[in-house]
């Protein structure tokens, strides 16, 4: 978090209140041990109506440990700033509460998300890989925060966000479309193509695939001030990042519809992307499905959980104060518009990043308890999970995005 209500420049202190090196290195081991101990207590005392709990095993502990390593890396990119910086953050959060409260957006969050204009001008460039070809598409985002919104000038100074980028795998004939929304620290072509198994979705299942890059990720993360990340401790940056991500994807949907008016469109999001996809699915009508993988339900609450601040740390007050803003940009405050048969969620029972009960279960309940798969793994374990792969394909079939088995596999032209 990095600006006062007056929107000063991004200012960071060299002093970090990070844990000592030794305790930081031992953290994943200690946290995994605590997780295993708690898992045994939950497993032995679980009730039928509670969150599914698997018998603790070495494999499950390994998944939890891997998550703890990932979490350690994410925290290294997001060190907690000192009290002086948090004082400025508190001022901006207070200004945000007043700004959003005066417009009643804290009570009616749908008004916060502005309706973007249709997307008409898109640049398309063909890219040839070793064996395949695909497209990169570019367009001007056109997003700006609301006039007078706290943090807006700082956000607009992140000029790399002004242009949206996306990967496109497209068939020559009309086909259903799947918009795949990546997670934190992604937004790079090789990684996104692999994690989403995009070529299988395109070549074998016959889908057109679009993979937009979220704000402050990939090419949109160039030239940022040190410490500027999305999501991160800067609450108003998180608000603007969420709003722009939703805006950009809604514009992209308008372009897809202008290309193939009759084709079905679905959303497929991972982690942070599942959070963004759930918001889009609560604002945009006409979507065939929304598949939410290990989704975040309340971004500000999640960041507060992982901030590492002690209970009596005065900076905790800022985190607590920001909770109404977190609820404003949460899908838990909106009504999903995707039909019930098109809602799907999958999550890991050993997830150490996105807490299954605090995040996923609440979103699942809010969405009317749609089809859900709990795989025995951590946050990153979905990639190796066969139940998840089968679930995603079944979701696409149930939503009508997949037709009869294809006799000819089209490759992008």
From Swiss-Prot:
Biotechnology: Has strong T-cell and IFN-gamma inducing capacity in human tuberculin skin test positive patients, indicating this might be a good vaccine candidate.
InterPro entries attached to this UniProt entry: AB_hydrolase_fold (IPR029058)
One GO term describing the cellular component: plasma membrane
Induction record: A member of the dormancy regulon. Induced in response to reduced oxygen tension (hypoxia), low levels of nitric oxide (NO) and carbon monoxide (CO). It is hoped that this regulon will give insight into the latent, or dormant phase of infection.
PANTHER family: PROTEIN ABHD18
Name under which the protein is recorded: Uncharacterized protein Rv2627c
């Amino acid at each position: 978090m990095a600006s006062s209500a007056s929107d000063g420049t991004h200012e960071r202190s060299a002093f970090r209140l990070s844990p000592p090196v030794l305790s930081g290195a031992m953290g994943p081991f200690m946290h995994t041990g605590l997780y295993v101990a708690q898992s045994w207590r939950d497993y032995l005392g679980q009730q039928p109506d509670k969150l599914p709990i698997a018998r603790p095993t070495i494999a499950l502990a390994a998944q939890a440990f891997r998550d703890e390593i990932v979490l350690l890396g994410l925290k290294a990119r997001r060190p907690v700033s000192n009290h002086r910086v948090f004082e400025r953050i508190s001022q901006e959060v207070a200004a945000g509460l007043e700004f959003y409260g005066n417009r009643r957006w804290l009570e009616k969050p749908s008004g916060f998300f502005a309706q973007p204009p249709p997307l008409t001008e898109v640049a398309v460039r063909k890219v040839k890989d070793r064996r395949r070809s695909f497209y990169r598409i570019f367009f001007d985002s056109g997003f700006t925060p609301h006039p007078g919104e706290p943090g807006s000038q700082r956000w607009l100074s992140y000029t790399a966000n002004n242009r949206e980028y996306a990967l496109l795998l497209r068939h020559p004939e009309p086909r259903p479309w799947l918009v795949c929304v990546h997670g934190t620290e992604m937004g790079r072509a090789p990684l996104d193509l692999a994690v989403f198994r995009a070529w299988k979705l395109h070549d074998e299942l016959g889908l057109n695939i679009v993979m937009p890059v979220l704000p402050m990720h990939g090419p949109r993360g160039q030239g940022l001030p040190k410490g500027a990340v999305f999501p991160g401790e800067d609450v108003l940056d998180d608000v603007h990042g969420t709003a722009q991500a939703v805006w950009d994807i809604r514009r992209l949907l308008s372009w897809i519809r202008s290309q193939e008016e009759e084709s079905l469109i679905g959303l497929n999001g991972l982690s942070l992307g599942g959070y963004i996809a759930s918001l889009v699915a609560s604002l945009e009508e006409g979507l065939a499905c929304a598949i939410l993988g290990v989704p975040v339900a309340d971004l500000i609450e999640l960041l507060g959980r992982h901030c590492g601040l002690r209970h009596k740390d005065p900076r905790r007050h800022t985190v607590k104060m920001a909770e109404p803003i977190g609820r404003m940009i949460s899908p838990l405050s909106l009504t999903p518009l995707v039909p019930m048969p098109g809602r799907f969620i999958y999550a890991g029972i050993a997830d150490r990043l996105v807490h299954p009960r605090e995040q996923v279960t609440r979103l699942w309940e809010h969405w009317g308890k749609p089809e859900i798969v709990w795989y025995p793994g951590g946050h990153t374990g979905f990639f190796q999970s066969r139940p998840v792969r089968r679930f995603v394909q079944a979701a696409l079939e149930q939503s009508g995005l997949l037709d009869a088995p294809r006799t000819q596999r089209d490759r992008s032209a």
